[in-house]
Amino acid sequence: MPNIEADRVTSVPENNDCKSKSQPLRNNLHETVKSYSIQGAATANIEPPAERPYPWGCPVTHTKEKFYTICADYAFLNQATSLCKSSSSVCSSSSEDKSALSNTINYIDLQTSESDSVYNEDASLESLSSNLGTRPLAWEIDKSDFSTMTSKLKRSGVKKQTPKKKPDRKAKPLRDCPQHLILDDVKQRKVLDLRRWYCISRPQYKTSCGISSLVSCWNFLYSTLGAGSLPPITQEEALHILGFQPPFEEIRFGPFTGNTTLMRWFRQINDHFHVKGCSYVLYKPHGKNKTAGETAVGALSKLTQGLKEDSTAYVYHCQNHYFCPIGFEATPVKASKAYRGQLFPHEVEYWILIGEPSRKHPTIHCKKWADIVTDLNTQNPEYFDIRHTERGLQYRKTKKGGNLHCLLAFQRLSWQRFGPWPLQLGTLRPEPQPPVQGRRIPKSESEDNVSKKQHGRLGRSFSAGFQQELAWKRMCNIRERRGSGSPESDTDYEGND
């Protein structure tokens, strides 16, 4: 940019040489300024007068320089001033160009001396402010847009915060609910009777998971360790009652231990201790003795209801193993319903707590009911190991179809359900007895364990039939120990605990 201040000395009329040299310089400056003035709109016709030593457009250079200088000095005031000094003729020509300029930029003409010299750059800012007086500065910043934006941001921020307060409003009824109601609701969804865990016979023998699980159920139903009144029994006592002899570590229980075998052993132990009970298959969707018509939803309802009571115990037959369900938890799907009560079935996910008799596994398993249903509904040659769900579906060498896995239920029966048995047996004495040759003893009658005194009251015929039934049971046990076994366990049990 040309420096106009350096050429002020050319205005001295005494130096003719300098005046002759400055004349062509003025013409060049005029041509340059003319190009700036007519750029964008040809609104003014500027001709170079002879008496005009410097063009009016030269202060544009100072305007750009002064703009940044004054902005730095008045930064805290958010104001800036563009200064220039021009003649009256230039003011008239510049007034015509104001329509083409922006409304935010205004030029202020300063009345100083009559000489056409540019405002002195070394003048102090204090003298500048005194000359301006009360006139507004040329450069002002409009903050209205910023204020509207900040107000919009505040409003939008308030709108975003309103949804966060909605969960608090919904949570108010939970706070107002009595504490005992919340406790009762949680108890219905989280069930674990510690007595069932106390009765788990752990550890087991190498392959005695079947009899160990059965002893666990029996102790819970009939012993003082659980919900009964009899002394608890051990695995060794139960094996002795069933006719097994030590050493028990050498017995291979796998080949002759099946679902029906456990139910028969349960009846024999009950007969030995003169207690009443029954056993049945709760849920077995495929294979022999399947529960036709039973669904997974119905089986889950019966299982959870039975675990809340103390009159029923369960055994779960899974891949090469038996163990006992002892509790459950109905976990809500949504976190906001952790302490809600009376949830719908689709709002919860059931987990079954299973006691483990083997010391090689955790003492309590927690398995999804959906995984248990998958295990029970898988048919050969596919199988699903519930204790190793990470392995997924696996295959074994066996014939297609069927599945031995199931849920077994063992229930304690009270004497009152069958009436006063001692009085009923006493009234049977005067009744005439049919001859021994023509009378057949029903199976249900032979399974009821009656004391020796009651046998004498019933007569010699009943006593003889009862002894025949016991002899038949012993023969069955001997055959099972020789390896004939249960047909259910031949293709399932591999000798692992």
UniProtKB/Swiss-Prot annotation:
It comes from the Eukaryota. GO terms for molecular function: DNA endonuclease activity; single-stranded DNA binding. Its main location: cytoplasm. Residues 442-451 have a biased composition (Basic and acidic residues). Keywords: Cytoplasm, Nucleus. One of its GO terms (cellular component) is nucleus. The keyword Ligase does not apply. Residues 152-169 have a biased composition (Basic residues). It is found in: Cytoplasm; Nucleus. Residues 1-24, 150-173, 426-462, 478-497 are annotated as: Disordered. PANTHER family: BASIC IMMUNOGLOBULIN-LIKE VARIABLE MOTIF-CONTAINING PROTEIN (PTHR16171:SF13), DNA REPAIR PROTEIN COMPLEMENTING XP-G CELLS-RELATED (PTHR16171). Belongs to the BIVM family. This is Basic immunoglobulin-like variable motif-containing protein.
